[in-house]
Amino acid sequence: MALTLEQLNSASAEQAAQMLDGLYEHTPWIAQQALTQRPFKSLAQLKYAMTRVLADAGEQAQVKLIRAHPELAGKAMVSKTLTAESTQEQTKAGLTDCTPEEFAKIQQLNANYNAKFGWPFILAVRGPRGVGLNKRQIIEAFERRLHGHPDFERQECLRNIHRIVEIRLNDKFGVEPTQGQQVWDWQEELSQYSDPGYAEKGQLTVTYLTDA
């Protein structure tokens, strides 16, 4: 049964923390600190409160959170020690059903990424609509982000973590972000007008016109 904001706002601190358990991978203090700002008028307000807690915690805490996440199709998946949430997400993306070639490719990408940045590659594998990216999309994102700057990539990992949390929170509260999905669909339709090399990937480029 889906949670409600009324239940969250009226619960004891311990009960409320239990309701939000599992949002941030092995890192309950973010939600716990955000809960001190109750009552929340909307889920958006709760999400924002959690992002501010992490932003204010500083770089060391942020990197520790990133490192608390498992690799995609990594050792934790093989040994079946993923959290229930991560298991569901990686399964939906097909990562538990890789071919030997796909598995070897992802393992090598994991190793290369970790060697360069010092933390695991983080991607919200359920994607912009929450239904799951496919393995090709995941590998393409992996390869693209391997070329990023460490400072930018740290922020990209945090952005994906917040997206993962948003999806998990929506699941807990039975929320379907229909307006956000509609905006995404519009972007997909517009992407056919992108420049060559981008349209094929479903990516939208923007051209700014200036006075002649």
What are these regions (language model features)?
Residues C98-K172:
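C-terminal non-catalytic interaction appendages of large macromolecular assemblies
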Residues T27-P28, A34, F121, L190:
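Residue-level signal for inorganic ion chemistry
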